[in-house]
Amino acid sequence: MTSRQFIVARDDLQQSRLIDVALPATDNLPVDGLLLKVDRFAFTANNITYAMLGDQLKYWSLFPAPNGYGNIPVWGFGDVIASRHPNLPEGERLFGYFPMATHLIVEAADVSKRGLRDGAAHREGVAPVYNAYTRVSGDPAFAGRAGDYQALLRPLFMLSFLVDDFLAE
């Protein structure tokens, strides 16, 4: 199985391409690893900001890409299609930060009934909000059209709290 990824040149966002990356078999996922199938995501001007500040704010480190290229991060939904974590079954639906790709491997850490954190080493050093995934299976606030609105607006809601905290300092 492969993941199709949309990547951009980090120094010229107008240069893009699609690449296919081989995915490991379930048995070869990291311990507590999840293979997520990206279902849908929002793409807004906010995502262009992530790309423009990718080096300074470490956004490019979230989703590794070939040298000189990057995966623009997006907010959206993914479904667990393979799991090596005992408390995260296949079929679980998650909301969080994804690459513009068909799949993502997450190393589940700090798992709770509400969500988890991606504990992959390459994701260290970024704001915790970008490593958090919310469990949304069965939550009507994330179903159908409501989910589309969540993908568009929830990141702005979270940003408002981060800006408030920053200004308070």
Task: Give short role names for the model-derived ranges.
Residues 5, 18-20, 98:
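Hydrophobic transmembrane signal anchors and adjacent membrane-proximal interface regions, especially
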Residues 1-10:
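Short, Gly/Pro- and small/polar-rich lid/capping loops
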Residues 16-20, 88-93, 112-117, 121:
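Short, well-ordered strand-loop elements centered on a beta-strand within folded domains, enriched
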